[in-house]
């Protein structure tokens, strides 16, 4: 190893130590962007009749270790307050999120006492009970509430309330760029509406853009779709699985949030099986369908492309949803 390579390895290890992430995340040598060859260019003609390969989605052999590093209150434009929890894990180097509705659901890893931390440290990272206000001194004592963290958790356990949960993968195009190619943005909004009506629940927001292939590959897939392929064919032409996502991190996050029994908002049967974990650490007691708003006679996304997208999910990916008659 020459000096330059040695300096790069030292830099990678130092960065990973700062992030508290495993070294194998950065074990592969980085290449300058000009030296990277495009290895995923489609080698087949568009619009071929391709059978999907087995998906990567499935039950993990082990669950990753997760840790909630910060929690913050977010007032929303809908009037509902949520608590945004940011997680790190030993499976990937992404910052996954838990959008928590209500104050009954708490993170065990967040509430755990860290060596040497002060009361201010705990409040700054969100490990407090009740609400923050100017002049507050203790993370454990809120003058507006007499309940401790453990009392809040015990109260939640006694209610036997099974929360609504949505496992949602990031979709920049559908959530931010107003795309009518998919209904991801609508599903996220609808999940938030349903959970806020009940008062307590969780949206696990995974950074798995494009069913796990990333935004750049997803945009290539869009171009292949414009050439006549459906979403599954486009992924396969780019040498990706039809669905490359993993839900192991989501399972571990739910466990950290104390949610062992859930009602899952999904049309995807593979997600139901995967989220329960290798040893049934989480139990899906009910699956609740996510029916497009326009299919229910409400104002929602109306485009030929979103219909084809959903039709492909039903016919090629086994999603449990009935196409409308018209």
Curated annotation (Swiss-Prot):
Keywords: Cytoplasm, GTP-binding, Hydrolase, Nucleotide-binding, Nucleus, Riboflavin biosynthesis. It comes from Schizosaccharomyces pombe (strain 972 / ATCC 24843). It is an enzyme of class 3 (hydrolase). Pathway: Cofactor biosynthesis; riboflavin biosynthesis; 5-amino-6-(D-ribitylamino)uracil from GTP. InterPro entries: GTP_cyclohydro_II, RibA, RibA-like_sf. GO terms for biological process: riboflavin biosynthetic process. Gene3D superfamilies: GTP cyclohydrolase II (3.40.50.10990). GO terms for molecular function: cyclohydrolase activity; GTP binding; GTP cyclohydrolase II activity. The keyword Isomerase does not apply. SUPFAM superfamilies: RibA-like. Belongs to the GTP cyclohydrolase II family. One of its GO terms (cellular component) is nucleus. This is Probable GTP cyclohydrolase-2. The gene is rib1. It comes from the Eukaryota. It is found in: Cytoplasm; Nucleus.
């Amino acid at each position: 190893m020459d000096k330059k390579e040695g300096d790069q390895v030292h830099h990678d290890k130092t960065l990973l130590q700062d992030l508290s992430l495993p070294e194998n995340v950065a074990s592969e040598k980085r290449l300058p962007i000009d030296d990277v060859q495009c290895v995923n260019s489609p080698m087949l003609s568009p619009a071929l009749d391709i059978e999907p390969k087995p998906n990567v989605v499935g039950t993990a052999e082990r669950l990753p270790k997760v840790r909630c590093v910060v929690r913050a209150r977010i007032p929303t434009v809908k009037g509902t307050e949520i608590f945004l929890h940011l997680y790190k894990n030993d499976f990937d180097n992404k910052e996954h999120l838990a959008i928590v509705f209500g104050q009954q659901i708490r993170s065990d890893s967040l509430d755990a006492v860290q060596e040497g931390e002060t009361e201010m440290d705990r409040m700054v990272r969100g490990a407090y009970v009740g609400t923050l206000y100017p002049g507050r001194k203790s993370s454990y004592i809120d003058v507006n509430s007499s309940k401790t963290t453990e009392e809040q958790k015990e109260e939640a356990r006694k209610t036997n309330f099974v929360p609504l949960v949505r496992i949602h993968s990031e979709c920049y195009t559908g959530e931010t760029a107003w795309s009518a190619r998919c209904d991801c943005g609508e599903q996220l909004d609808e999940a938030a509406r349903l959970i806020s009506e009940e008062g307590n629940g969780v949206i696990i927001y995974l950074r798995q853009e494009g069913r796990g292939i990333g935004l750049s590959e997803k945009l290539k897939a869009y171009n292949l779709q414009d050439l006549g392929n459906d979403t599954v064919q486009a992924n396969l032409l780019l040498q990706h699985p039809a669905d490359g996502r993993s839900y192991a991190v989501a399972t571990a996050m739910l466990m950290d949030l104390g949610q062992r029994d859930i009602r899952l908002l999904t049309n995807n049967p593979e997600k139901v099986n995967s989220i329960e974990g290798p040893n049934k650490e989480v139990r899906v007691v009910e699956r609740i369908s996510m029916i497009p708003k326009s299919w229910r006679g409400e104002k929602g996304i109306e485009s030929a492309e979103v219909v084809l997208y959903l039709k492909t999910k039903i016919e090629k990916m086994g999603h449990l949803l009935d196409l409308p008659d018209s």
